[in-house]
């Protein structure tokens, strides 16, 4: 079938009015503005307090994770947070999946992991081979994730879903097998398994698909994803806006290159897909984006001390009002004010009023304001 980047690849999504409302918004801003996003760590939401304290505003989108939806320890906290964010504040939701599987498929009580280095006996090849224990685990987990997405669907929440992220590297178990091969058929099979199971078996209508393979060997057909993303973390002593802009500009070109391989799968010149900086460690400079025409659909800065000043043990350094400060190595209040105030960036306050969500600030922010003001 013809590749049409102006419509969601999901036939089910095209029939969901709320999903199409969000889709049409994404298409309308792409190439004109960039949506701000941050990855959430937990319900404490200290990252929110950093941005709100500096600007009175929040990112337009938040990133969540199905990391606790499978494995030995399970929790629906991330699902609850996403639903509240969408319905209370009208914010957009992105989901990735740090997919925990048994470290040893023959010993499920031996713990779960998603890092390749921690897994001793879970074959990626078996994961896409019917009749194996790994295959049964994979199908079980996909079906479990489907129940979480179905719950959000029933609440009117659309998600930008980014499974099998950073697959071009070997640090996650779903990463490349046989890097020197022309294609990595195992990855492609796993991607299509997830897509087919959620689209055709569960018939979910609230998914906008994000491919984040970021390697020629993970190229997939463009009719199985809507957005192409790249995760890149700048790591250099020169942290000037100019240096970071130069780095992100090269990342944009790199992603365009990856997209050409997906176009080749379909036998076309280009996919026309929207491009995103799906993970990063520094907020990009809006003026740098404008000057270099690297118009990401959105950028998503990671959580924790990528945003707040660390205080030890993974927690932020708090003042007497329990307010975290920006990590001075990466952010400042002035930078947040300037970037959020730039008309290129879409923040929560700049989003339109969607039919699926409210316009209230999160309860965590209200509680913080109450105590800060002596309540």
Regions found by a protein language model. Give the residues of each.
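Aromatic-lined carbohydrate-recognition surfaces of secreted/lumenal glycan-active proteins
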Residues: 35-39, 162-164, 191-217, 270-283
């Amino acid at each position: 079938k013809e590749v049409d980047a102006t419509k969601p690849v999901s036939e089910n999504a095209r029939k969901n009015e709320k999903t199409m409302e969000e889709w049409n918004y994404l298409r309308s801003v792409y190439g004109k503005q960039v949506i701000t996003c941050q990855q959430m760590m937990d319900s404490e939401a200290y990252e929110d307090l950093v941005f709100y304290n500096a600007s009175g505003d929040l990112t337009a989108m938040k990133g969540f994770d199905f990391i606790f939806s499978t494995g030995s320890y399970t929790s629906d906290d991330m699902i609850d947070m996403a639903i509240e964010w969408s319905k209370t504040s009208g914010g957009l939701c992105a989901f990735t999946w740090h997919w925990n599987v048994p470290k040893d498929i023959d010993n499920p009580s031996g713990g779960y992991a998603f890092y390749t280095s921690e897994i001793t006996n879970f074959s990626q090849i078996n994961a896409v081979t019917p009749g194996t224990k790994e295959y049964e685990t994979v199908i079980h987990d996909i079906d479990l994730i489907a129940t979480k997405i179905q719950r959000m669907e029933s609440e009117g929440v659309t998600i930008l879903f980014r499974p099998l992220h950073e697959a071009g590297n070997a640090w996650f178990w779903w990463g490349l097998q046989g890097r020197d091969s022309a294609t990595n058929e195992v990855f492609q099979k796993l991607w299509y398994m997830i897509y087919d199971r959620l689209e055709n078996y569960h018939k979910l209508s609230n998914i906008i698909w994000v491919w984040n393979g970021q390697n020629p060997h993970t190229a997939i057909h463009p009719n199985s994803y809507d957005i192409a993303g790249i995760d890149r973390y700048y790591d250099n002593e020169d942290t000037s806006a100019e240096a970071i802009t130069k780095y992100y500009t090269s990342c944009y070109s790199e992603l365009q290159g990856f997209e050409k391989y997906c176009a080749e799968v379909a036998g076309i010149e280009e996919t026309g897909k929207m491009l995103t900086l799906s993970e990063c460690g520094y907020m990009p400079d809006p003026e740098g984006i404008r000057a270099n025409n690297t118009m990401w659909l959105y950028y998503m800065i990671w959580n924790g001390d990528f945003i707040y000043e660390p205080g030890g043990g993974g927690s932020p350094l708090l003042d007497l009002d329990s307010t975290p400060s920006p990590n001075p190595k990466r952010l400042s209040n002035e930078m947040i004010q300037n970037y959020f105030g730039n008309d290129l960036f879409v923040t929560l306050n700049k989003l339109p009023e969607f039919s699926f969500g409210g316009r209230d600030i999160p309860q965590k922010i209200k509680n913080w304001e109450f105590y800060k003001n002596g309540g």
